[in-house]
């Protein structure tokens, strides 16, 4: 008689575990496959943080079903250099329906994935492109090395004295 309650409890525990495994695809956090060790924000929270901190934003726009997006995810997530550089940005990860409708976020088309860089005021800087990529898809990155290069360029252009001087000239 004692085996029935144990069997029932074991079955319930096994079923609960199975549900947990099925419902979890490993991308539940804001990282969505691009690395949960990176401090990701929503676009709204990211813009607020950038305005308060003076850090530029790096925005990744991708789709859950996209093959090129899936190929970039592990390269991005496993790059120690991207992880280190991410501390100099407010990192925003937009998937599927989170993609903004604003045309500023698709300067040369709506292909995916796209990586865009915004200044601390939230303005997209379309001049920061993947220099080593396809000129028809300027914001499409296929390797961690390309992303690192874009991050370094954005950091140089959107932070420090060079950015402040350019920003001041624009206001005058």
Curated annotation (Swiss-Prot):
Disulfide pairings: 66-69
Reaction equations catalysed: [protein]-disulfide + 2 glutathione = [protein]-dithiol + glutathione disulfide
Biological process terms in GO annotation: negative regulation of endoplasmic reticulum stress-induced intrinsic apoptotic signaling pathway
Keywords: Disulfide bond, Endoplasmic reticulum, Oxidoreductase, Redox-active center, Signal
Activity vs pH: Optimum pH is 6.5.
InterPro entries xref list: AGR/TXD, ERp19, Thioredoxin-like_sf, Thioredoxin_CS, Thioredoxin_domain
Keyword Disulfide bond among record annotations: yes
UniProt motif Prevents secretion from ER: location: 169-172
UniProt-recorded Gene Ontology molecular function terms: protein-disulfide reductase (glutathione) activity; protein-disulfide reductase activity
Entry-linked Pfam families: Thioredoxin_7
Signal recorded as keyword: yes
Ranges for domain Thioredoxin: 27-156
Entry EC no(s): 1.8.4.2
Subcellular location: Endoplasmic reticulum lumen
GO CC list: endoplasmic reticulum; endoplasmic reticulum lumen
Signal peptide positions on this chain: 1-26
UniProt tissue specificity: Widely expressed.
Stated role: Protein-disulfide reductase of the endoplasmic reticulum that promotes disulfide bond formation in client proteins through its thiol-disulfide oxidase activity.
Record's protein name: Thioredoxin domain-containing protein 12
Source species: Homo sapiens
């Amino acid at each position: 008689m004692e085996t029935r309650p144990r069997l029932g409890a074991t079955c319930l525990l096994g079923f609960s575990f199975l549900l947990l495994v099925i419902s979890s695809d490993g991308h539940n956090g804001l990282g969505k496959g691009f690395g949960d060790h990176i401090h990701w924000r929503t676009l709204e929270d990211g813009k607020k943080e950038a305005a308060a901190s003076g850090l530029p934003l790096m925005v990744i726009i991708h789709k859950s079903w996209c093959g090129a997006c899936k190929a970039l995810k592990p390269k991005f997530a496993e790059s120690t250099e991207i992880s280190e550089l991410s501390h100099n940005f407010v990192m925003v990860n937009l998937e599927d329906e989170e993609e903004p409708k604003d045309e500023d976020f698709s300067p040369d088309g709506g292909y995916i994935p796209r990586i865009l860089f915004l200044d601390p005021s939230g303005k997209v800087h379309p001049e920061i492109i993947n220099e080593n990529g396809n000129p028809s898809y300027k914001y499409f990155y296929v390797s961690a090395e390309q992303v690192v290069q874009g991050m370094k360029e954005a950091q140089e252009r959107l932070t420090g004295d060079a950015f402040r001087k350019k920003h001041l000239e624009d206001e005058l």
